[in-house]
From Swiss-Prot:
Gene3D superfamilies hit by this protein: 1.10.287.2480
Full protein name: Fusion glycoprotein F0
Cytoplasmic membrane side: 515-537
The family this protein is said to belong to: Belongs to the paramyxoviruses fusion glycoprotein family.
Coiled-coil regions, chain positions: 125-153, 459-484
Extracellular domain ranges by topology: 27-493
SUPFAM superfamilies cross-referenced by the UniProt entry: Virus ectodomain (SSF58069)
Top-level taxonomy: Viruses, Riboviria, Orthornavirae, Negarnaviricota, Haploviricotina
Disulfide bonds: C28-C407, C60-C182, C283-C311, C292-C301, C326-C335, C350-C361, C384-C390
One Pfam family matching this protein: Fusion_gly
Amino acid sequence: MSWKVVLLLVLLATPTGGLEESYLEESCSTVTRGYLSVLRTGWYTNVFTLEVGDVENLTCTDGPSLIRTELELTKNALEELKTVSADQLAKEARIMSPRKARFVLGAIALGVATAAAVTAGVAIAKTIRLEGEVAAIKGALRKTNEAVSTLGNGVRVLATAVNDLKDFISKKLTPAINKNKCDISDLKMAVSFGQYNRRFLNVVRQFSDNAGITPAISLDLMTDAELVRAVSNMPTSSGQINLMLENRAMVRRKGFGILIGVYGSSVVYMVQLPIFGVIDTPCWKVKAAPLCSGKDGSYACLLREDQGWYCQNAGSTVYYPNEEDCEVRSDHVFCDTAAGINVAKESEECNRNISTTKYPCKVSTGRHPISMVALSPLGALVACYDGVSCSIGSNKVGIIRPLGKGCSYISNQDADTVTIDNPVYQLSKVEGEQHTIKGKPVSSNFDPIEFPEDQFNIALDQVFESVEKSKNLIDQSNKILDSTEKGNAGFVMVIVLIVLLMLAAVGVGIFFVVKKRKAAPKFPMEMNGVNNKGFIP
């Protein structure tokens, strides 16, 4: 590969500049701006009839040969595709069933196209299979290799005939076999047969491997020249067409093919090409890492759940929650509108004042800190907490310095790598401006003791409400406890008083008994002779 090709690939994969990344201390997140949108707004259908020719009536009976081997490959591939076509009809019935929507995702191996796109494509394929539709398409191609055909439901499709293999078989191979049988000494004929047969065999293999629905558009399904003609015929502006022509690889990745069926010696399939009808509107990307605040061994942790791509479209903001919904080429972001969610423009407040905004910024909560690295376009967010060692490094000198506990933002201008224990993360070398927006970490607003357990994808204001309710419950519990303690104290005092009174009563009783026992006894006057005349000694 020449240095010019390498340089071209690097330029295509790297934004041309103008990116600006903001690190938000308040929420441990980054917002990267400066991207331009390329949004899919529709699909363009191209129907192909790949003509094989009359191979069924060609036979080789004069022993092994290259021609015989290639001919058997062609016949076997045609039979295999008939089986795939029959299985395809059964699978499409499942895809179109509302109860079997989950089968849609299984219909495409890589999930490049959305489920809705596959379902819509299958609906068109079912229409093309209706009696008369294939005949009408082939009729439109009788005198030309390319024509626009209108289906019975009013859908206009581009029809393309691929006759190279058929023409070779009918005009060169068949006469040669009839004359010399299959033992043709001309090696050039055998090589030519293999070359013309290659596209057909590869188309069969791709539909067979992917059960009738391919996850992308290969050069065999659609040559580059055919793709250029199809894109040029799309009902959109010249600027959008030029952008798609400049990014043909992305058009292929975002498209898919569906097998229509085998009709005699004709293989009919359709290719769905994305129409990127919205271009050059602003897009930005949000990344985040867990933000935790600790107290006495307990933690309150928050993680922004509104991460993903955002693009402006027709005055509204479209949010793409899954990173695979969008792909970056240079400074353009290719996204599928079917995967987007319209959000209010106030959602931008989550990037400015997440603690005070009334917009329901989505977060997840937890009481257990998680250490991780979130790579951003111009750097990395590092969440480093207890039990984990974190550091940044250089490809030339190794470790530069360790990182402290908490959330840190590492610019790709300051380091090449980030390490958490053993895993090493390589930072991108995309150029752009970077700056930090200071702010108090939102997690520090919460007492870890009162912080709720794990909650996923809830509004931040609900977290505040939940904590406030927890505080109120704790306050009420304390009041009840205080009143209970006071009541218990009063009850104890009454019991003590009663016991004291009883003890006092017992003491008084004992006092009088003792006093009575100590008092002198009162006997009658002593009788003697002096005072008792009747006394007889």
